[in-house]
Amino acid sequence: MRNVQAQPLVSPTEPMIDPFGRAVTYLRVSVTDRCDFRCTYCMAEHMTFLPKKDLLTLEELDRLCSVFIEKGVRKLRLTGGEPLVRKNIMHLIGNLSRHLKSGALDELTLTTNGSQLARFAGELADCGVRRINVSLDTLNPEKFRTITRWGDLSRVLEGIDAAQKAGIHVKINAVALKDFNDAEIPELIRWAHGRGMDVTLIETMPMGEIEFDRTDQYLPLSQVRADLASQFTLADIPYRTGGPARYVTISETGGRLGFITPMTHNFCESCNRVRLTCTGMLYMCLGQNDDADLRKALRESESDEHLSQAIDEAISRKPKGHDFIIDREHNRPSVARHMSLTGG
């Protein structure tokens, strides 16, 4: 058999630093605004999606991600929409995995609704994906269909099974929704921890126009934590995954539970991430409208120098924090664009 020498490991690159001294080491990339679900807190039922001609090609996404990695990004998360509905997405993931093999990237991961996981779990594992987040707000099939408008819970559970069998660590992300799933959060935690999965609870965020009043859905996680503390023994721990969640352990289950609280206790002081949309717009903050058009810089020159300068200029504008509020008087989102465009 022919000997194949391993690729030399790349020396870590100094990260980009924003105006407030925070290192930018985490890039979230929305590869599509399309999704096979229509979760009520995320999308309008009759969404108008971007024309496909406006989307970056997979080759352009690869080039952009690679420049960010050269500039010190160590964690790359693919999001959507639903990333696994993007045509030929595994071609992109397979190409990006070269940065894992070289040592330039610590982690390549994705956030998914789980609907396509049974199909792609094996390929994802082969590409070096070791952890994924699966969005799952309820274990009740009828409520699941209601919140997603037409999703099939059994298909998602099959996908989770496939991912775990492929050796991928699954974390469950659940949006806490008042009078919808608040009573079943303890059951969801027990189920996930019983399968070796962490859980992260998320406050609903005021992004994009939807048919429902978000003030009716909003549930502060401080209240959820207090309710959980009456049933479980919670202990704060310093565990971090590179994201904004603050974690506790639950003695009764032995598992970890995270809280993402953009409304009641924001995570801006340690923000290490920026977001790239499928059209090449870079958002320095989830809760601000300031953006940078990297598609223009990408297509103006085959050289990456101009693109690198555009990224530097954008990072120099990264704000100190977001402006999320729940506008109870006017029922308006703080940010007009939908999460499916920015990348959840």
UniProtKB/Swiss-Prot annotation:
Molecular function (Gene Ontology), one example: S-adenosyl-L-methionine binding
Coiled-coil portions: none
CDD domains: Radical_SAM (cd01335), Twitch_MoaA (cd21117)
Catalytic activity line of the entry: GTP + AH2 + S-adenosyl-L-methionine = (8S)-3',8-cyclo-7,8-dihydroguanosine 5'-triphosphate + 5'-deoxyadenosine + L-methionine + A + H(+)
UniProt-listed Pfam families: Fer4_12 (PF13353), Mob_synth_C (PF06463), Radical_SAM (PF04055)
One BP annotation, GO: Mo-molybdopterin cofactor biosynthetic process
Binding sites annotated in the UniProt record for S-adenosyl-L-methionine: Y41, G81, S135, M205
List of residues binding GTP: R28, R77, T111, K171, R273, V274, R275
NCBIfam families tied to this protein: moaA
Family: Belongs to the radical SAM superfamily. MoaA family.
Protein name per its UniProtKB record: GTP 3',8-cyclase
Organism expressing this protein natively: Brucella canis (strain ATCC 23365 / NCTC 10854 / RM-666)
